[in-house]
Amino acid sequence: MSDTRVTIVGGGLAGSEAAWQLAERGHDVTVHEMRPVVKTAAHHTESLAELVCSNTFKSTDTSNAHGLLKAEMRALGSLILWAADEARVPGGAALAVDRIVFASAVQSRLEAHPRISIERGEITTIPSPSVIATGPLTSDALATALRARLGVDALSFYDAIAPVIAYDSIDHDVVFKASRYGKGETEAEREEGAYLNCPMSREQYESFIDALLAGDKYQGHAFDEAPYFEGCLPVEEMAARGRETLRFGPLKPVGLRDPRTGRDAYAVVQLRQEDRAGRMWNLVGFQTRLRIGDQERVFRSIPGLANAEFLRHGSIHRNSYVNSPASLTPALTLRDDGQVFLAGQITGVEGYTESSATGLLAGINLSRVLNGGEPVIPPATTMLGALYRYLREADPAHFQPMNANFGLLDELPKPERDKRRKRERFAARALADIESWQREHSLDAALPGAVTT
C-alpha cells in the first residue's frame, strides 16, 4: 500500500466521491476546497458537494440511462448516491434530495474518515498524485496551469451544445445522406456522403423560423451568462438577426441537391455523426438556449425529425472543460503524468450523476496506480464504460460535453424493435457486465455504511 498522500482539488460531487474511494482503499487524502477563501458566483454555502442547480439526480429507473448509471455506481459503493438516499425527498421516479441534508451527509462522512483531511484555500498548480475535480467554475489560476500543461486550446470556458438525435428515430424516407459538393475525407464519404440532410421548402423554412423565434428561452443564472461568439451563436439568436440569416448560415442549401427532386432545397438542416457506431447524430449549428420542451417541439418540426428521440439537449453556459479526446489518456489522466486524474464536469461530462461517476472511477484507478497497477475501464456495454469511451473517441475537432444516454452503449447482438424492451435489455446486460468487471478486477465496493481504517 502506497503511503503517499493524495490531493483532491475540488470538494464537489466528483472530488468528494474520489476522496471516499481512495480513503476506503487505504490512502491518505487531503481534499482542497477553495470556498470560502475564494468564493464563486454560483455557490451559497461553504459545504462540500453543494448542489448549485437542480436538487434532483434524475431517474432511478434502470430503463432510463441515468437510472442505469446509478445502479452501476451503487454496485461500486458510491458515497454520493448513499448521501442522496439519506437526503431523499418525494420526487416520483427521480432521486430528488434536500440540498442541505445531502451536502451535510457527504461532508460529515468525509470529515469522520480517519484518512481524509479537508483544507480550505485555492490550489493554483497541479499536484501529483491528485484528482483534479474543480468543476465548471474552475478558478482562473488553476485554469491557466491546466492550459499551460495541456496546450492553449485544450480548455474551454463555455460550452455551446447542439442537440443529439438517435439515428433510428430519423425518417430516412425524408432525410438524405450527402456531403456538400460531394466532398469527404474518404472515398466512402465522397460516394455516400458524411451528413444526413433534412431538406426544407420555403413554406417549411418560414414556419420553422416562426416557431424558433416564438420559443421559450432559458434565462439561466447570472454566473451562467455566456458571451456569444460569432462562430457559435445560439440558433435562435441567428434567426432573430434576420429571417434569412440561417439560410445563409448553417442551413444553407448550396451543394446539397435533393436526390428525390434533383434540385437544391430552399434550406437544409444537417446532422453530423457523433459516435463511431453512427447511432448518435447532432444538429449542426443548433446550439441553443431554448427550454427542453420547446427544443423538442421546434426541432421536431424539421422534415424527417417528427419522431426524433433526443439523446442530448442543446445548451449554452459557463463550463470549464478539457478537450479530453485530444488531451487526456483513456483513463482521464494527464499524458505526462499517470498519477494526475481529472474527474467531473471538467472532463466533458454533463450532470450530477455523470460527474460523480467519473470521480468514483478516478478514485478506484488512482488507488490501483499507486499500488503498482494499471487503470481499468468498464466495458462499453455499461453506461460508465460507454461514457469513458465517448471521452476517449469523440472527434476532438467537435468535442462537446455529454450526458448519459443509451446511444452511447454498444448495440445489442440481436435487434429489438420495442423501445422499452430494448432499454431493459441494455440495462440487464450492463448490470451483468459491471458485476463481471468488478469481480475480474477484485473491486470491492467502498460502502459508505462503515468506515475502513
What are the functions of these language-model segments?
Residues 2-14:
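Beta1/beta-strand and adjacent pyrophosphate-binding region of the FAD-binding site
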Residues 355-376:
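Internal hydrophobic alpha-helix adjacent to the cofactor/substrate pocket in enzyme cavities
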Residues 88, 401-453:
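C-terminal auxiliary extensions adjacent to catalytic cores
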Residues 283-349, 356-358, 376-393, 401-403, ...:
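A glycine-rich dinucleotide-binding beta-alpha-beta segment and adjacent secondary-structure elements
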Residues 109-297:
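Predominantly flavin-linked oxidoreductase catalytic cores and closely associated redox partners
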Residues 5, 28, 154:
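Residues at the starts of beta-strands that form the adenosine-phosphate
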Residues 20-82, 380-391:
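N-terminal FAD cofactor-binding segment of flavoenzymes
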Residues 60-107, 111:
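A conserved beta-strand/loop capping segment in the N-terminal third of enzymes
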